[in-house]
Curated annotation (Swiss-Prot):
Protein function: Could be involved in insertion of integral membrane proteins into the membrane.
InterPro entries named among the record's database cross-references: Membr_insert_effic_factor_YidD
Name under which the protein is recorded: Putative membrane protein insertion efficiency factor
Organism per entry: Streptococcus agalactiae serotype III (strain NEM316)
UniProt family annotation: Belongs to the UPF0161 family.
Amino acid sequence: MLKSFLIFLVRFYQKNISPAFPASCRYCPTCSTYMIEAIQKHGLKGVLMGIARILRCHPLAHGGNDPVPDHFSLRRNKTDISD
């Protein structure tokens, strides 16, 4: 039930708050979609993964493809980093 509520909050952000700002996420999937997928896959640990992802998303980040890993990790997928 807590997972559903957290996902509801992210979807509320996606539909009602995010459209008011220009697109700025440097990753695919977007940080909010990543948060939802991480919560679905890893439960409450997924919230930590989503927060870590948001902290990595800044103007100096390379961005690119960074899917939710199958195992819990607060770091970016090393196999998906493109130089």
